[in-house]
Amino acid sequence: MKGSYKSRWVIVIVVVIAAIAAFWFWQGRNDSQSAAPGATKQAQQSPAGGRRGMRSGPLAPVQAATAVEQAVPRYLTGLGTITAANTVTVRSRVDGQLMALHFQEGQQVKAGDLLAEIDPSQFKVALAQAQGQLAKDKATLANARRDLARYQQLAKTNLVSRQELDAQQALVSETEGTIKADEASVASAQLQLDWSRITAPVDGRVGLKQVDVGNQISSGDTTGIVVITQTHPIDLVFTLPESDIATVVQAQKAGKPLVVEAWDRTNSKKLSEGTLLSLDNQIDATTGTIKVKARFNNQDDALFPNQFVNARMLVDTEQNAVVIPTAALQMGNEGHFVWVLNSENKVSKHLVTPGIQDSQKVVIRAGISAGDRVVTDGIDRLTEGAKVEVVEAQSATTPEEKATSREYAKKGARS
């Protein structure tokens, strides 16, 4: 009896659970059916529909620039070194004690300026001796000429022999030769004295002195007294690939001087501007380059000997060229391309043919026209036909736009 009672309770519990489960199943099905028309309607009203509607999010922020038409100079570039137009080691041409230096290290001097003095005492003595010998021989010559005149008169009356007359004539000629030798000795002694005063052979800047006052110096010293570098003007020697030779020669034939610019080591600051002076007469077979020399006035002393610079030589100017920022030019499997914005700020990929370019701008020879807008920043997030938001360059890195950019990267572009 007790077992029968428990069995009835088990049956009741099972029936209740089954009823509850059936109710939940029926209720869930009705909810699903009632929600379906609304979902369908929402999908129909969504512009993108289906899965694309779920991807809607903020527009991709980009920066853009307009292609412009302008004259673009064509430069040939190379690495070079500044060299003095002339470098002279000032040496003494006579032996003696250095008595004085008349320059300040690093100063600019003119040709003929006194730089140093050698003790002139010995040269003055030698000059005086030569001058004394000359005076003595001149007196001897004068006396010999008087004797010759008397001999010539006596020879007319046969008071002297022809032999005596010839001997006197020979003595006069010999003394005249001695006079010429004496005059040369005087000139040599005077030259030695003049050389005791050492002057600048060229205009330029003197370097550090190589010898101190009081030292004995000679004409054989290799170090010299000081080195002068001529920096007004000054030269730039740089190299160009042999493939550029024809371009340079053709530009020279135009008859106008080719402008050469010297830029600093980082290629960010223009130091000076000069003109092409000459090309070397042969190509370096090892490097396949040719040396080129340009000359600069350098009146502002912007260039210094042995200074490393970047050279830029203007060889041509391309007129009416379509120019865009270099940042807009991209490279893909199909070649160079840019992202072009239409009036609705939707982007499309255009294959282009680039021309002259540098770190700032590039000439586009085909693919776009002047007035087209191209994307310069935010390119990595673009897809064909995507609509974007064009932002100003100065506000492109604000925290708000950075957050928008991150959100866009998560959700995808909106078409």
From Swiss-Prot:
Chief location bin: membrane
Region spans: Disordered: 31-60, 392-415
Bias (Basic and acidic residues) ranges: 399-415
Topological relation to the membrane, as annotated: Peripheral membrane protein
Keyword terms of this UniProt record: Cell inner membrane, Cell membrane, Membrane, Signal, Transport
SUPFAM superfamilies from the UniProt entry: HlyD-like secretion proteins
Compartments, as annotated in UniProt: Cell inner membrane
Single GO MF descriptor: efflux transmembrane transporter activity
Induction (record text): The mdtABC operon is transcriptionally activated by BaeR.
Assigned GO CC terms: efflux pump complex; plasma membrane
Signal peptide annotation: 1-21
SUBUNIT field: Part of a tripartite efflux system composed of MdtA, MdtB and MdtC.
Role played: The MdtABC tripartite complex confers resistance against novobiocin and deoxycholate.
Cited HAMAP family: MdtA
Similarity section: Belongs to the membrane fusion protein (MFP) (TC 8.A.1) family.
Descriptive protein name: Multidrug resistance protein MdtA
